[in-house]
Amino acid sequence: MTFTVTRERAQWVHDMARARDGLPYAYGGAFTNNPRVSTDCSGLVLQTGAWYGGRTDWVGNRYGSTESFRLDHKIVYDLGFKRMPRGGPAALPIKPVMLVGLQHGGGGVYSHTACTLMTMDHPGGPVKMSDRGVDWESHGNRNGVGVELYEGARAWNDPLFHDFWYLDAVLEDEGDDDELADPVLGKMIREIHACLFNQTASTSDLATPGEGAIWQLHQKIHSIDGMLHPIHAERRARAGDLGELHRIVLAAKGLGVKRDEVTKRVYQSILADIERDNPEVLQRYIAERGGL
């Protein structure tokens, strides 16, 4: 069952890892409360899963090995690990806090594992669900260093690995992340919402007396469209735009969107004006359309 990791817990996990970054590799070892005590690859991965899960029995407890995953040992599942589906993380219904890669060669030096902590972009960064994550690995010593965090550590999907798992856990408030928690952004959203949906009064000279604040912004925009488009269409029709003239003809015949008698008379009057002032435009329209 998927469990939830608090942000405080995720921060603690990263703090524990940072405190052990740079330790020498310790085959068969296990982390303890002493940050100078090291472990090997599987100890690191399994104990990190226990950290995320809030287990209290992790001190000096290796839990298993790389082969514990391959052999489906119960402890692996008890810690919360599950096999990655064929489609990878994209096929999961959640965004896991930890991803794991394994190489199986029979155990010992012939097997390896590493993980990526997905609850931070980089060491010391804020806790958040990350696309990149922080790689975390214990490997053979290089210049005396075996445990590495981020720089020098393999990612969960390194080409070395061929078996992939994830910790069935999510970060709390995963979908809400930081963006909407930003007070500046929140203020902007409230202001935009107010502009769009607060009701205001009409500023027209012909507004109905006593009408008050009844109009939302989108209604005023629709009103502007309703007022300006007919004016624009009439001007273009008088100048010879037969497409706009056709709109006016339809409205005058009661075939437009609005078919009331007042609307028809308005556009019949416009046609009469065009016939009086620009008869050649109507003649071209009739020639093309075969009549009004």
From Swiss-Prot:
What EC number(s) does the entry state? 3.-.-.-
Highest taxon of the source? Viruses
GO MF terms listed in the record are: hydrolase activity
GO BP: any one term: killing of cells of another organism
Keywords, A to Z, come to: Antimicrobial, Bacteriolytic enzyme, Cytolysis, Host cell lysis by virus, Hydrolase, Viral release from host cell
Q: What class of enzyme is it?
A: hydrolase
Q: What does this protein do?
A: Endolysin that degrades host peptidoglycans and participates with the holin protein in the sequential events which lead to the programmed host cell lysis releasing the mature viral particles. Once the holin has permeabilized the host cell membrane, the endolysin can reach the periplasm and break down the peptidoglycan layer.
Give the family, as the similarity comment puts it.
Belongs to the L5likevirus endolysin A protein family.
Q: What is this protein called?
A: Endolysin A
Tell me which species this is from.
Mycobacterium phage L5 (Mycobacteriophage L5)
Its lineage reads: Viruses, Duplodnaviria, Heunggongvirae, Uroviricota, Caudoviricetes
